[in-house]
Amino acid sequence: MKPRLIFQYFAYSFLVFLPFINTLPCSYQNPRIEDVLLEVPIEHHHPHRHRRDSENPTETPPDLQKFAPLRIQLHYDKSIQNLTAEVQHFVNTTLLPEAVGYWENALRVRPMKTPIRLRRKCISSFYYYKQGMRNVACDKGCRERTTCGEADIPNDHLLDCLACNNTDDCQTTGEMGEGVKESDFILYVTAHNSKRCEGPETLSYAAHCQQEADFDRPIAGNVNLCPSALSVHNHDYEILTSTVKHEILHALGFSVGLYAFFRDKDGKPRTKRNRYGRPTSLNKQRGYYDWDKNTITTVLREEWWTGEGKVIHPIQMMVTPKVREEARRHFGCDKLEGAELENQGGEGTVLTHWEKRAYENEAMTGTHTQNPVYSRLTLAFLEDTGWYQPNYEVAEDLHWGKQLGCDFAMKSCGEWIHQKRILGEDAYPYCSDIKHDGTKSMAITRCTSQRDSLALCNLIPFQKELPPQYRNFMSLPGVNPDGAKYYGGSVEMADYCPFLQEFEWKMPEKEHKDSRCELEGNGKEGEDILEVYGENSKCFEFPKPWTERKCGRIRVLSHYMAGCYEYQCTNGTLYVGSYNATDMYPCYAENQKVHIKKVVDGWLREGSLICPKCSDYCSSCGPPIVIPDYIGDPELDEPCFAFSKFSVFGLFSCYLAILYIRF
């Protein structure tokens, strides 16, 4: 993903703000083969039995005992102490406990019966397996330090070192640590300002480092928090917690390096194993074991619509049972093969996230855009690992694409937009309002589908032609015939599909403000369209732009076609309120207009709000009533300075006002 796209409105009241659409790509990197230690003995019910005792490495282990809530043990590295006291307190008491607590509540595992003791890293890349051997033996002994990502693993968490000169000459050195008790996963938390933290978009990253012997489940991992990206500001809380939850999930299982280790519901490997119990094919070039087609398969979309004709479009599908079931359920498409995986973004993003075009704000897509949710699809993925039983009650509702059918799920966004345009219908959840043409802003505010935020259509021109398979328009209003192939949504991972996206207001030398209605700090008293931000506010759309009038002059606020306003539900009726209003206005029916007229700072401000369905905002709504012809404020005279004994000053003031508007 490219960094933030900044633009500027040209209405004078927008000159003090710099609105920009924010995307934060995931910084995941699949750990190298040599950095992941397998075969950690976990000693379930048979403390001296090792899975290698089995003559058939593909047989089901006997320990299919009851599942219990996942227990994650946090171990803070000393690098955390380099953070400021305020940030350190936030990390230790809020950020990590909340992120970890979410997954502990969401997942159940086969519980560890004894303390986790991790393997030591070998000096060389050679090691020995031997029947009855409790631990993997190193060829030339063990390293002094064993790391997990950016963290040093304490000796107290490690097994002793088993080293062999040959299969019969083995000895144990070092001491066995006490291990980590009452835990199923150890998460080592670091705060190193590493090279990967140099990018302004990187907040944190994580990966697994060791897997247990019986079922191959990851049992240890590292999450590194980039110090310069940590913030205690309220506006940043959602994105920080969601990002850390996202990265932890990579360590728990959502990783291209773990797909070949998945198991079915009976505990049997989904991918064929060799006599050592490893997947049969190691892809050395890509750094992971290859999986069988019952996990991920390639599907060809042979008539993929583009603005320049149809092409063949290959996609990668996760086709495990629960994932397929949830994907079909979500879209309402019984012939969908599975859930599409990301095909853009480079190493660490491709195949390790859901496809952005198909699952826009699902938290396990490859870049954060807005309102991230962990849906049933991601929990189904975790169930299909064979390691977890998810609690589907914690799943959040994914509205993107919900029940939009097979055409939405299986065809290009360009075809969806094209067909809707022919039918004269809205292309939801896509859009076609151009944000800017490279020289001037054309942005128009709208409401998100959940009406919890303002949003802009992220359709922009690129400097180069888009890849042929992502040219989603035959033509665009106001764009020359050859220019459509340069236009696409600003989020490349979404196949350049344009959609409404939340944004931030960046004010010079001040904090960022974003477009969410619920945050009171996003508002500004007396601003042009008289908005009210706060926990009781939602987004309302306008039938036409607002105006400001004064001294015979008029300004049309054409960039605004939606705003945030206070609402309440009383006696089965939805009410909406604006800034500087003594009473709230009733919304008796969907699409009813509320007319607002206020004199603020010497200007007559006029605009109308479109009422949504009462049930969109209120849990209890009354029966329909006869709607009055007009609901809103009475007519007001346009203000202007009067000539009196201060007539010279009045004239001068009006002259200044005219100059200000012209500017």
Swiss-Prot record:
Single GO biological process annotation from the record: cell division
Catalytic residue positions: E247
A GO cellular-component term linked to this record: membrane
Record flagged with keyword Magnesium: no
Gene Ontology molecular function, alphabetical: metal ion binding; metalloendopeptidase activity; peptidase activity
Keyword tags: Cell cycle, Cell division, Cytoplasm, Hydrolase, Metal-binding, Metalloprotease, Mitosis, Protease, Zinc
Compartments where located: Cytoplasm
SUPFAM superfamilies on file: Metalloproteases ('zincins'), catalytic domain
Residue positions binding Zn(2+): H246, H250, H353
SS bond partners: none
Function text: Metalloprotease.
Name this protein carries in UniProt: Leishmanolysin-like peptidase
